[in-house]
Amino acid sequence: MNAYVRRSCVAGAIFLAGAPVLAQESARLALGEKVFAASCKSCHDTGKAQNDAPQLSEQTEWKDRAGKGRPELYKNSIEGFSGYFAMPPRGGNAALSDDEVKAAVDYMLVRAGIR
């Protein structure tokens, strides 16, 4: 087998090995988009004049939050927090599961340009 064929086989195997991960990530982001539209958009996509929630277009705001780590973002989104900035637990939708809230956070980070 020549070197080109070997490299092609290796590249194909690597691509196929990653396919389930990409499909899983895509499904998670689709869930996040659905949750965002139903429960998060009213605060996070309305403009700062309406509230102090970070908007999807505000990459700097999201970078600051992402710097705390996803576990902290997930915790704050699930449990809520109060103070100068406040957010109700689960964005005000008690019916959301932890995984749904986490998917919405992941979706918002991706939409804000943060991986």
Predicted regions and their residues:
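Bacterial N-terminal signal peptides that target proteins for export
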Residues: 1-12
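Hydrophobic alpha-helical targeting segments used for export or membrane insertion
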Residues: 10-21
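Electrostatic cytochrome c docking/interface patches
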Residues: 19-35, 50-64
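The canonical Cys-X-X-Cys-His
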Residues: 40-47, 104, 108
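Axial heme c-ligation environment in periplasmic c-type cytochrome domains
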Residues: 50-51, 76-102, 108-115
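Surface-exposed, polar/charged faces of alpha-helical domains
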Residues: 57-64, 68-71, 75, 79
